[in-house]
């Protein structure tokens, strides 16, 4: 549909629409976000999910076409990566389509415990040395020889490195560095192919949902260091060490989020965080109050204090935890929900926090377009009242979502979401 507006005007119009929603004002209409993920494979009809890892140019063009055709207010296009960089290093805890999985299979994470229960002191005392000589060898097959390197503090001194250099000459260590070099080359190719995407989309009038990321400290430990089983046991067996680790990681997460300020665009600049293991089903309220919420809250407050808008993705069901979000700065964040009842979220947070979400991915997969339209109409009526609501799918789109249903979702705000 022709608007007669320039890309610059459309970009600012969309940014203002989002700003108004964040600030709990009434925009001209309800904003809508498209999370493309692996959906471009289905939309363009000639690619597989594996192409997001192995044909970066084609995947970027497919993603661009998807966004330009459907015309959301914001987009999130996080999917894929360099399959060759991954292949060079041999990840033990990750499988991706086209290598170990079918070309149209979703990527898979494999639970592990790279940080063992009795290694907290080692990790806390020197996370850099732990990462190099323990974490990387356990997570990447090609980097297993790094376990033979000398402790990093043992290299301090004007001439010490020379006397400690022998391990670096071992054939297996050299091979590990060669694998890392090859991965770096492949990642550089990937970066060159994808680094201009956000600016290209901006020049077409489309802002991104987020300009950077910052991880929740507890999730860093549970996702990447101790695994879910290990972290859940630590809440009983190693609570003090777990809390110390969360505190240490918090500063890194804040720094990661603040780096978003360097983004060329964004008014305001937005920082995303996917929250994996803080929902109702993972821990009790007491455990949430002790282990999860304190560092997450401080992360969000620290970023909003710097003028950033935090966009936490509350995965799972957060119905029992909604009141905690009232402790966050009013009108400064976007609470994106996956499976939380949005009517309840609106009732609790409506005058305090912009909420985002709503359309179940299952509906986009199997329902008729009319069913999707009816669902969106009702959702907009309930959650859009008074402003402070952004429509999107419950999760990132896969290649199983029906294109006509995704289009219906996006078009619904133009039909039913005008204030």
Positions of predicted regions on the chain:
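Catalytic cores of TIM-barrel enzymes
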Residues: 1-419
């Amino acid at each position: 549909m022709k608007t007669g507006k320039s890309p610059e005007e459309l970009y600012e119009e969309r940014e203002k629409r989002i700003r108004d929603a964040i600030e709990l004002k009434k925009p001209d209409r309800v904003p809508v976000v498209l999370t493309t993920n692996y959906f471009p494979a289905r939309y363009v009809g000639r690619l597989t999910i594996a192409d997001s890892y192995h044909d970066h140019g084609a995947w970027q063009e497919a993603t661009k076409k998807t966004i330009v055709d459907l015309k959301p207010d914001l987009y999130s296009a996080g999917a894929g990566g360099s399959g060759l960089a991954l292949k060079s290093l041999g990840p033990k805890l990750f499988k991706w389509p086209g290598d170990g999985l079918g070309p149209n299979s979703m990527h898979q994470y494999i639970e592990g415990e790279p940080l063992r229960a009795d290694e907290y002191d080692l990790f806390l005392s020197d996370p850099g040395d732990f990462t190099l000589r323990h974490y990387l060898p356990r997570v990447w097959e090609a980097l297993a020889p790094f376990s033979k390197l000398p402790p990093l503090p043992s290299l301090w001194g004007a001439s010490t490195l020379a006397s400690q250099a022998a391990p670096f000459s071992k054939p297996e260590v050299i091979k590990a560095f060669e694998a890392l070099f090859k991965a770096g080359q492949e990642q550089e190719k990937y970066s060159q192919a994808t680094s201009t995407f956000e600016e290209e989309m901006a020049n077409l009038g489309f802002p991104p949902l987020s300009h950077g990321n910052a991880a929740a400290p507890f999730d860093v430990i549970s996702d990447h260091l101790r695994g879910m089983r290990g972290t859940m046991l630590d809440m009983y067996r190693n609570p003090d060490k777990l809390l110390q680790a969360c505190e240490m990681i918090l500063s890194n997460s804040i720094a990661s989020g603040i780096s978003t300020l360097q983004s060329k665009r964004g008014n305001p600049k937005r920082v995303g965080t996917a929250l994996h293991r803080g929902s109702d089903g993972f821990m009790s309220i007491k455990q949430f109050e002790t282990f999860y919420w304190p560092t997450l809250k401080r992360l969000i407050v620290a970023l909003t204090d710097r003028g950033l808008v935090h966009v936490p993705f509350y995965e799972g069901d957060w119905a029992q935890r909604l009141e905690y979000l009232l402790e966050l700065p009013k009108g400064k964040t976007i609470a994106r929900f996956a499976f939380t009842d949005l009517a309840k979220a609106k009732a609790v947070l409506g005058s305090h926090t912009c909420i985002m979400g709503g359309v179940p991915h299952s509906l986009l997969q199997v329902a008729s377009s009319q069913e999707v339209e009816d669902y969106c109409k009702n959702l907009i009526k309930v959650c859009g009242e008074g402003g402070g609501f952004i429509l999107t799918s419950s999760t990132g789109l896969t290649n199983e979502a029906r294109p006509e249903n995704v289009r219906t979702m996006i078009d619904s705000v133009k039909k039913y979401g005008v204030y």
